[in-house]
UniProtKB/Swiss-Prot annotation:
Highest taxon, organism lineage: Eukaryota
Gene name for this UniProt entry: LGALS3
GO CC list: cytoplasm; extracellular space; immunological synapse; spliceosomal complex
Native source organism of the sequence: Oryctolagus cuniculus (Rabbit)
Main location: cytoplasm
Domain called Galectin: residue spans: 110-240
Chain ranges for the short sequence motif Nuclear export signal as given in the UniProt record: 218-233
Cross-referenced SMART domains: Gal-bind_lectin (SM00908), GLECT (SM00276)
Protein name as annotated: Galectin-3
């Protein structure tokens, strides 16, 4: 199965010191006064840093003019992403077509448009907080009424916590894939990142790789909407190319 980078490579950067001017690798954020490390707004997950899968180093130089793959928000030249929370300017970052970021609180359920569908190296980031007495939450990558990728953490299924992944075509659900590793906590903030690869979705939660789900729908360009639902307070939803 093809893969743009191995999981070991993706997670190998966690011990490197942070680059100047941008938050360091996830999990190594210095604490900011009065808030979570790296939190840019109330409800942001600790160390919220869009634009990189956990531990992934930027593929290009840092961050010279027009450097391909430079971290978003760096003063490397025109067209770079703005810093988190700042408005975008003219000349979007090359390859970031499209980039969408909505800062909350957002209504739930919430639909995030994915114009042009999903594609390899697209990174979707969802930030929020699990509500007290939560039962479930769900991400649904949709093609019309079909669901290409259903990501469904369940907090109490027969007194167990489990994550269920599946695909729905013509109103018929396929074979469930279940994950017992459960990184979500009642009342706690979370960050979900979904990285699209040629053959699969990678999912990371709270800065750590969680699971991989092989594509069951092969035409990725038809997957043009992400539905977010469940017992959460939704702070932000965004997508970008990395």
């Amino acid at each position: 199965m093809a893969d743009g980078f191995s999981l070991n490579d993706a997670l190998s950067g966690s011990g490197h010191p942070p680059n100047q001017g941008w938050p360091g690798p996830w999990g190594n954020q210095p604490a900011g006064p009065g808030g979570y490390p790296g939190a840019a707004y109330p409800g942001a997950y600790p160390g919220h840093a869009p634009g990189a899968y956990p531990g992934q180093a930027p593929p290009g130089p840092y961050p010279g003019p027009g450097a391909h793959g430079a971290y978003p928000g760096q003063p490397g030249g025109p067209g770079a992403y703005p810093s988190p929370g700042q408005p975008s300017g003219a000349g979007a970052y090359p390859g970031a077509s499209p980039y969408s970021a909505s800062a909350g609180p957002l209504p739930v359920p919430y639909d995030l448009p994915l114009p042009g569908g999903v594609m390899p190296r697209m990174l979707i980031t969802i930030v929020g907080t699990v509500k007290p007495n939560a039962n479930r939450l769900a991400l649904d990558f949709k093609r019309g009424n079909d669901v290409a990728f259903h990501f469904n953490p369940r907090f109490n299924e027969n007194n167990r916590r489990v994550i269920v992944c599946n695909t729905k075509v013509d109103n018929n659900w396929g074979r469930e894939e279940r994950q017992t590793t459960f990184p979500f906590e009642i009342g706690k903030p979370f960050k979900i990142q979904v990285l699209v690869e040629p053959d699969h979705f990678k999912v990371a939660v709270n800065d750590a790789h969680l699971l991989q789900y092989n594509h069951r729908m092969r035409n990725l360009k038809e997957i043009n909407k992400l539905g977010i639902s469940g017992d959460i307070q939704l702070t932000s939803a965004s997508h970008a190319m990395i």
